[in-house]
Amino acid sequence: MAMVLENSSAELLRALAHLSNKRGNFKDGAALKCAVELGIPDVIQKHGKPAMTLSELTAALPIKQSKAHCINRIMRVLVNAGFFVEQRSGDGKRDDEEESYALTPACRLLLKDEPLNARAHVLFTLDPAEMVALGSLSEWLQDDYPTAFETANGKNYWDYIAERPARNKLFNEALAVDSRLIATVLISEFKFVFEGLTSLVDVGGGTGTIARAIAETFPNMKCIVLDLQQVVEDADLEGTENLEFVAGDMFEKIPNANAILLKMVLHDWSDEDCVRILKNCKRVIPEKEKGGKIILIELVLGGQNKDHVTVEAEICMDMEMLASFGGKERTEKEWAKLFQDAGLSGYKVFSNLDSRCVIEVYP
């Protein structure tokens, strides 16, 4: 109590507001999930006008009209979170003027027709199983389960989604969207990383978005996508003359190649598991002098000139890895230790992809 009394009223109110905001951040996510599931961004986009009034919006949504009066409260949260802009039908001076809503650039990433839409990512990260895992951290810290996800759901993440085809599909869709963005940047900015290679294995490559882009850019390179049996079968994937899909387990065996590509794979795993994966990669590539290398696309925590939004995104991603996978985001020092423990000779970090970096690791 003495500590509280030492602070001014203004400081206490700011502290309380800060606590309330952080405690309530998950409510932004809940409102966002609701908007995506109801298709609110698409309804407003298809309206054909710069903004859509609240009454027009509620009439167009697939909801019980007896609950239509609640939509403005959900929209209020989303406006405050920066996903919509609220406008007034008149000059904004009268209280009875009806609200109308327009999309922000962030909201356009939630449109179904947007090639790089983030709908799947929103839905799978805000899945109840994910949220209850985050809410079980204190219990997990006191039990014997490897992850909070297992504490909350009774099984690990991979077994959980393997038993739920729709959830597994959503996960792979989210990865594919992310890969489309990364593939564009890789080919335009980091083409030199792949030049001279005759073969490459994309480990955990999912539906092959990145490998397909690489194979098209380098028609003389043989590209293989390695992923679990259910991923390869469920996606009904077709290869091309220089692109092949192989079902397998990176912990067991990886096909031989000049280079191995791992995009946002290692952050899902513990240090011990990462060392196992890297050692398996090292076994199937030639020595450095003959062009052998492992290509990582991963977050590298820390560094200079990162804005608050980027740092917050990195921290939140690390918390997700902690709760659901038992993995982690890593600093450059932590990456270097992993490479050393796996018996790799060196590495080079190239210009980053926002938070993520391209890292070449050598046998």
UniProtKB/Swiss-Prot annotation:
A molecular-function term among this protein's GO annotations: O-methyltransferase activity
Pfam families referenced in this protein's UniProt entry, alphabetically: Dimerisation, Methyltransf_2
GO terms (BP aspect): alkaloid biosynthetic process; methylation
UniProt keywords, alphabetically: Methyltransferase, S-adenosyl-L-methionine, Transferase
Catalytic residues (positions): 267
Residues that, per the record, bind S-adenosyl-L-methionine: 204, 227, 249-250, 263
E.C. numbers: 2.1.1.397
Catalytic activity entry: 10-hydroxystrychnine + S-adenosyl-L-methionine = beta-colubrine + S-adenosyl-L-homocysteine + H(+); 11-demethylbrucine + S-adenosyl-L-methionine = brucine + S-adenosyl-L-homocysteine + H(+)
Protein name (record): Strychnine O-methyltransferase
